[in-house]
Amino acid sequence: MAREKRKRKENVFMKRLLLICLMFCSLMVQAQDLKSLFVAMPDSLSPLWTEVNRADFGDFLASNMKARVRNRFGNFSEMLKLTDDYLLMQSTSVSTMEMKLLPVNDSVNIICMVQTYQAPVADSRISFYDTAWKELPVSQFIQLPEESVFYKTPETTAQTDSLTDVRKYADMYLLKASLSEKGKTLSFVYTTPEYMDKENSDRLTSCLNMKQLEYEWRDGKFQPKK
């Protein structure tokens, strides 16, 4: 009799343990959307917004309201888009933030964040995080384009001299990055010519073979689009 009671208790304990595990797994799955992840974002990575601010953005959009919130510095930030895997924020009057939830494999997602500053020409910073907001090496998920990839290969000595001369005025490598809302692509626009005077900007632009590059998420990393 005592042995049967002990066995029943063990069965009850195992069922409760299984239920707790299932609930925990369910919560983890629910947290794999950008709204939940954004709210859980550490304050150290979110100097403009409190946790309440971050929750308000999503709640306002879900209620079909303008998601405009006064930030810690007394200015307004506005969330423009929010889906399960994409977020677009007008952080300040001169900066934006994008996030994209991307699959590394069937069970692991990471967050790609693109912060773009218009000062006055757009330039972006890309970072990657796991879903616990631990920063990950950028090189693990993308090899950023070299500046030279945007330029034509000179075919004559005169073209080489002209390119060398005009690039003296292009002393900053400025690159605007943008995540796609619906796809899993990352585009780069070469913005260096935009901060130069018109004459040198036109000269530099004539030496470019492209101003935009597209990368696609493939095999757990961003790679140049085929």
For each of these PLM feature ranges, what is it?
Residues 89, 116-122, 201-206:
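Short consensus segments that form the blades of beta-propeller domains
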Residues 92-94, 104-106, 114-121, 189-195:
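Short, flexible beta-strand-to-coil junctions
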